[in-house]
Regions:
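Early extracytoplasmic/lumenal segment of secretory-pathway proteins
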Residues: 20-84
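Short beta-strand->loop
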Residues: 26-29, 91-100, 110-111, 114-115, 126-128, 134, 140, 227-247, ...
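A structural signal for short loop-to-beta-strand junctions that line the ligand-binding cleft
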Residues: 69-74, 92-124, 140, 151-152
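Periplasmic solute-binding protein
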Residues: 79-90, 109-137, 165-166, 248-254
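Ligand-binding pocket segment of bilobal, Venus flytrap-like solute-binding proteins
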Residues: 167, 172-239
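Mature extracytoplasmic/periplasmic domains
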Residues: 251-310
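Extracellular/periplasmic bilobal clamshell ligand-binding domains
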Residues: 298-334
Length: 334
């Protein structure tokens, strides 16, 4: 595993006398996204936060450390990591009326093993110049032969695409989803590669007309001097607005099985699912809050309202192994 960057956050100088309380966090989410929230949490509660940040390897670390792990809480950047932690039995039940009231049932585990903190949409980006807006587009349309040679995407095995394929299985079954995957593969402009931003760049450069990507990357690219031109070259489309709604992925949190400070971890989750932190957390990363009624960032709000797929995430998660199997069977990435 690569060297882990450790970030220790706390307000020891200004915190109240009970600041000896602590919560230890392993985070897949970048420091700039969580630091303002954790600082405010410490200010409000006196509970210090110690953070270990890494882009990869944290789940393996929690598993390897076992009972000796210092992690009380894991913050994930995608839904797949939440499911991995649960499947490996590295979590404990989140019991909180506050969390249950703040987070709709579709965005928390039915057994209380994880909870979502922010939402993002699996959008289809389209070239403004060559395609225009596609308000009636569906994920199913991506397999239509009329789009042959026009689609770009990252690996089908990436958690973002794996979740989408799992949702297709949940809605359409194995056989129809395999046929759909074969159709999408036939329409690819190039082999799956790169990240979501690379797909938008490819649209800008004329390599493809459509690209799969998470909603928040558009906001991130518009803030980046080098990438702003890529983002300005595409429209953001919310698929399946005429039927079930667009597929949603999430970031989230779990309390670890061997947490030494589970009460403080729960307090942090309760704080992060309440209105103030929801607004901060979602706005910093151009995402959508999981709590209803929380104001969106002005940029995200400018994309307009849309219908979400209401299928619970823990239902979709049941089909992740089969989704991976189908992606391999159709040789999607080859």
């Amino acid at each position: 595993m690569k060297t882990v960057f450790t970030l220790v956050l706390g307000l020891a100088a200004s915190a109240p006398a009970f600041a000896s309380d602590v919560v230890n966090i392993y985070s897949f989410r970048q420091p700039f996204l969580i630091q303002p929230i954790l600082e405010d949490f410490t200010k409000q509660t006196g509970i210090k936060t110690n953070v270990v940040f890494a882009k990869k390897g944290l789940i393996e670390r929690v598993k390897r450390e076992g009972k000796h792990s210092k992690a009380d809480l894991v913050l994930t950047s995608n839904f797949s990591a939440l499911i991995q932690l649960e499947d490996l039995k590295l979590t404990q039940t989140i019991k909180s009326d506050s969390v249950n009231n703040n987070v709709p049932a579709a965005f928390r585990d039915g057994d209380g093993q994880w909870v979502a903190l922010t939402k993002r949409v699996r959008n289809v980006y389209s070239s403004k110049e060559r395609v225009g807006e596609l308000p009636k587009l569906t994920y199913e349309d991506l397999a239509d032969p009329k789009y042959k040679g026009q689609i770009c995407t990252r690996s089908g095995k990436h958690p973002y695409n794996l979740g989408l394929v799992a949702s297709m299985i949940a809605h359409h079954g194995e056989a129809q989803t395999k046929e759909w995957l074969e159709g999408v593969k036939a329409n690819l402009a190039r082999k799956p590669q790169g990240n979501d931003r690379a797909q938008v760049k490819a649209v800008k450069e004329g390599l493809c007309n459509l690209a799969l990507g998470n909603s928040y990357y558009l906001g991130k690219m518009l803030e980046d001097k080098e990438q702003k031109g890529w983002a300005e070259a595409v429209n953001i489309n919310f698929p399946n607005q005429t039927n079930r709604g667009s597929h949603i992925n999430v970031s989230g949190a779990v309390i670890t099985k061997y947490a030494k400070n589970p009460e403080n971890a729960l307090k942090l989750i309760e704080y992060m699912t309440d209105s103030k932190a929801q607004n901060m957390y979602a706005s910093l990363n151009m995402e959508y809050p999981v709590k209803s009624g929380v104001e969106l960032s002005s940029l995200v709000a400018s994309w307009g309202s849309f219908k979400e797929d209401s299928l619970p995430l823990d239902e979709i998660s049941k089909y992740r192994p089969l989704a991976l199997k189908l992606i391999d069977e159709v040789k999607f990435d080859l």
